[in-house]
Amino acid sequence: MTTRPPSLPPGPRLPRLAQSALWAVYPGALSRYCKRRFGPTFTLRPLGIGDVVVVTQPEAIKEVFTGDREVLRAGEANAVMGPIVGKHSLLTLDGERHIRHRRLVSAPFHGEAVRTYGERVAQIAAAEVDRWPVGREFPIRPRMQAITLEVILRTVVGVSDERRMERLRTLLRKITQVGVVEMWIVWAYPHLIEHPVVKRLSTLRLMPEVDRLLYEEIAAHRAEPDGRDDVLALLVAARDEQGEGLSDEELRDHLITLLVAGHETTTTALAWCFERLLRHPAAHLRLQRELDEGADERYLDAVLNETLRVRPVIDAVWRKLSAPVEVAGWLLPAGATVMPSIEIVQHSAAFADAGAFRPERFLEGSAGGRASHPYTFIPFGGGARRCVGASFAMMEMRAIVRTVLERVSLRAPTARSERVKVHHITLVPARGGRVIVTGRRRGVPRAETACTAAPRAEVPETRRPALA
């Protein structure tokens, strides 16, 4: 047993306000600078959150993901999200309650249950894609958001009342537009959430109506359970080992987690997929050809995985320490927050030519390029807290990308990469992933027609500003 006192790794001495501002706007740039300056494990001190220890090495990340869950508490770290997602959300639960809820919630998001939704997702995507203008530049992220929101409302919540559906669409679009300043206030000063002025001016003012609509849908599902195959119907029917189901409040919290967190992350991943693909003509051409020829989805999966690697949707995940614990050789004190950096580990030397967009690295038998350590690729987190909706998200992205490329030919308006911008908790294309539809595809034309207007040369990718 060690007798050394807990301590923190070194970190920048900037004032807390300056660290908060840099972390809120340029999280990746700040982390990259600190890694160069202080090494692979360092401490940030933003306002209101306390000491945040960032770990960037696979072995240290493994220690965080596989360590004692009673000490490394994800729910406590996410507690500031409680006013939106609720106290029963998988994001905010710890311990036995998290285990119970995860078991109940997991079933609809795995295996055959997920595969049955693929055709429905494709139909929703096709209806949206057929409305896209030809020959005019537009950001693809809002279009992806329209698709993913509809998928969530129809396949997850199973909303059948059109008036309820339209109102939920409107409210959820507003909620997902929360700005960096409001988000930072929530993270840094959670006690302000209960202030009447903050409630009136923030997106929290919308939550009572969202809750009312969700409770109406839950009641409708309980009253008429037969003939429904949406996720909510499966959650209503789910029972634990004691035969207990989920309460209305618990169902509400899981639904709002999926609505607010789930569809926003998938939206962003899809926007980055097209932003990357359209700037890499060889990958675009190969994917188009394989889809046209009815090949399996291995290369499509490789494109999606490489997108999630080079453009992670969130910068990091975190755990709050309830007791001292050793991570990366440091005995960290209770009360500190440990934050595995998704972006840094996925751009590490573990990947050959890590900055390049190379889907082939994810194909079995490819000529190198893919890291062998399992904790170098963590877009959905890891361990017992790995995203419960990961399989659903991958199914959804496959169906949407396939549908888009089957129905329209796309090109990027410029060869220059879009920079990364912080949009509350997600890292989005700064210009929304702008695209141009060059034509509608009738039948399945030769794959080459989809890529003729792609940029001829790859312009070096622009990274978030480095800190000197």
Positions of PLM-derived features:
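Conserved cytochrome P450 K-helix/beta-meander segment immediately N-terminal to the heme-binding cysteine loop
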Residues: 340-368, 451
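N-terminal membrane-proximal hinge/A-helix region immediately C-terminal to the signal-anchor transmembrane segment
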Residues: 1-100, 115, 119-127, 159-163, ...
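Residue-level recognition of short, solvent-exposed, well-ordered loop/turn junctions
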Residues: 333-334
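Conserved cytochrome P450 K-helix E-x-x-R motif and the immediately C-terminal K′/meander segment
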Residues: 19-39, 212, 294-328
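Cytochrome P450 heme-thiolate monooxygenase catalytic core
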Residues: 2-8, 73-81, 97, 113-268, ...
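Cytochrome P450 catalytic-core helices
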Residues: 265-290, 391-408
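Cytochrome P450 proximal C-terminal region
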Residues: 35, 125, 173-174, 292-295, ...
